[in-house]
Amino acid sequence: MTQTQRPDVRELINRNPLSRFQKLIIFLGFCVIALDGFDIAIMGFIAPTLKLEWGVSNHQLGLVISAALIGLALGAIFSGPLADWLGRKKIIINSVFFFGFWTIATAFSHNVEQMMFFRFMTGLGLGAAMPNIGTLVSEYAPERQRSFIITVIFCGFTFGAAAGGFSASWLIPQFGWHSLMALGGILPLLFAPLLIWLLPESVRFLVIKQAPAARIRAILNRLYPGQISDNVRFILPAQPAAGNAMRIVLSRQYGFGSLMLWLVYFMGLFLVYILGSWLPTLVKAVGMTVSQAAIMTAIYQAGGTLGSLFAGWLMDRINPHRALGIIYAIGGLFTMAMGYAAGSFALLCMLAFISGACLNGANTGMNALSARYYPTQARATGSSWMHGVGRIGAILSAFAGAEMMALNLPFESVFLILGIPAALTVAGLAAKGIFAAGHPPVASTSPASVRGAS
């Protein structure tokens, strides 16, 4: 009698080098995040034209941007449990179709009220796409490279935002703001069919859901041709936590860690958004020109890609909580130091670059940390809820920034205050690292689909 093989999917992925199929999955993930970044950045590029054509105020533009951010938060919060129930691929493809459709609809807006509604609907799709593609890619990444791979795909956000800027510089003068919105919708609608064809469902999700062995085997044969025989009986480890995805995220085993992830990401996005939005206004108030303010803000954002790659690299080499805590701490210190460099444009630019690299990089690294923390059956929910709570921080940053401007605080006081959320990110990571670093899967198994799916 031929002996039945019982391969461990987790170990199979971990012991093999990256295959061509895994690299394709990473590339597709990068593209989804890039489309997300392009679409989210669009409003910033069309805002000056809208003010001229429609005569809208900054307050009205702020409402449109806030509507999109609220949609992003809700899309993230509700999509995670759906992805843990229906599958990552279905949610990703539908969300890409969804935000593509509503972005095209936005191009036909006739007033601010219509645009607010359309951007809210767009935000729902954008919020669903980003955390779930991160979850799917993480489940195909070897654990030794998982953090770096996740930060690589999230670098697609800055790539997409930059592509939006270059597109805007040519399209808007030639064809108007509607053309940029149309492009932002057409690209995801064209890309979604490619995802249907090329993107696989997470093999670890299929294991948890006890999918047919033939379907799992087909994906594994694309990953590692010749390593999986037809005579295979897959098994599943005992569940690391009981209940559905939402109960697992909020359970005694994972609840404290979830709260710390939410705290850190809330404060991290609060910091990045408040600096990205209000930095030009702050530096203009201390005598710098509009051109200098724009250059310094661009330098602040440019540091994010380098910082993200460094964060992922460091997380794969030392304790990830320590790695992110150090990076957030450095970012907070350099942010506070900016308050004492008002007299030197060159020094402010240097400090802004390091601050942006650290804060943006650490925020990207949080996606890798959440993917490492949760088991497969709750990973999409855990990561998406972290994104949703973080987006609330981004929304509140707009109001906090306006309040600080209204108080006419001294330049250095504003940056010292921003040291508080930075300190809270470090404290949250330290607490999670001490009390909820992670929960390895239970070793025992029960008959089902595939073993090692965590």
Residue ranges and their predicted role:
Residues P173-G185, M405-I420:
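A membrane-interface helix-boundary motif in multi-pass transporters
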Residues M1-R15, L198-G257, P440-S454:
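Intracellular cytosolic loops and amphipathic helices of Major Facilitator Superfamily
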Residues Q145-P173, L187-P188, H387-S397:
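Glycine-rich segments within core transmembrane alpha-helices of 12-TM secondary carriers
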Residues M43-G44, L250-L309:
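Extracytoplasmic gate region of multi-pass secondary transporters
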Residues M1-F38:
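Cytosolic juxtamembrane N-terminal segment immediately preceding the first transmembrane helix
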Residues L74-V112:
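Conserved MFS/SLC helix-loop-helix module at the cytosolic interface between two early adjacent transmembrane helices
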Residues G55, G87, F108-Q114, G125, ...:
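Helix-breaking motifs and short loop linkers at transmembrane-helix boundaries and internal kinks
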Residues F310, M315-M366:
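C-terminal transmembrane helical hairpin of 12-TM major facilitator-type secondary transporters
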